[in-house]
């Protein structure tokens, strides 16, 4: 007999959530028909139901780490043991998977937001993801790809400079602005300075030609 909760390989998050909801609705229906044999079972499931509902609402917004969900649910004053039971259920249903969560977090934020490996590692650590899982997720980022990402950030920031610096002081101020954009994303200081200077000099040359 097929387990109605266990997802099939390749199912996306929305499909897995829908499958879990269907299984839970079926369980509730059987309870109402008297299939749940004891008052204790019904009371236990009722307590879990609200925790599960809150967890699914959070997962509807975006994928989350187990630790992140644990913290959010704990802040709502739910019983710790019930939270753990619900999180175990969701883990078995593959709706919580720190490995997949970390891989996707790194992939999206490195490509779309220009984040460095250092910042991504810190973000995942803050979400309670284990060091080994973080390291495997960060292996996706090739050092040369990270340099290309940093270069793109520097070029974008340098393009916001609308005039040629009047003097050295002006140039240094503009350079600090470009370096700051890289530093906020966690790129190494030496690389940030080199790329910022390169991007700013290219921007100044472009302004001179126009």
Swiss-Prot record:
Residues of the region (Disordered) are 28-47
Q: Name one GO biological process term.
A: regulation of DNA repair
**Cytoplasm among keywords:** yes
GO cellular component annotations of the record: cytoplasm
Q: Name one Pfam family in it.
A: RecX_HTH1
Q: Which domain of life is it from?
A: Bacteria
Keywords for the protein's UniProt record, in alphabetical order:
Cytoplasm
Do you know which InterPro entries this protein is assigned to? RecX_HTH_1st, RecX_HTH_2nd, Regulatory_RecX, WH-like_DNA-bd_sf
**Chief location of this protein within or outside the cell:** cytoplasm
Q: Where in the cell is it found?
A: Cytoplasm
Protein family according to the UniProt entry:
Belongs to the RecX family.
- Function description: Modulates RecA activity.
- Tell me what this protein is called: Regulatory protein RecX
């Amino acid at each position: 007999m097929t387990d109605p909760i266990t997802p099939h390989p390749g199912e996306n998050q929305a499909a897995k959530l829908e499958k879990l909801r269907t299984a839970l609705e079926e369980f509730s229906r059987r309870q109402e028909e008297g299939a749940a044999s004891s008052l204790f079972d019904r009371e236990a499931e009722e307590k879990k139901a609200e925790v599960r509902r809150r967890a699914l609402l959070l997962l509807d917004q975006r994928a989350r780490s187990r630790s992140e969900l644990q913290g959010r649910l704990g802040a709502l004053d739910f019983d710790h043991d019930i939270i753990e039971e619900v999180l175990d259920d969701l883990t078995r249903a593959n709706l919580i998977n720190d490995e997949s969560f970390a891989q996707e977090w790194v992939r999206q934020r490195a490509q779309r937001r220009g984040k460095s490996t250092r910042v991504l590692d810190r973000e995942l650590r803050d979400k309670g993801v284990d060091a080994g899982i973080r390291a495997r997720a960060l292996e996706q980022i090739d050092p040369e790809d990270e340099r290309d990402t940093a270069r793109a950030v520097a070029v974008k920031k340098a393009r916001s400079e609308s005039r040629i610096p009047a003097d050295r002081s002006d140039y240094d101020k503009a350079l600090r602005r470009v370096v700051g954009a890289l530093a906020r994303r966690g790129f190494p200081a030496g690389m940030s300075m080199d790329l910022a200077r390169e991007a700013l000099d290219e921007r100044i040359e472009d302004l001179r030609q126009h």
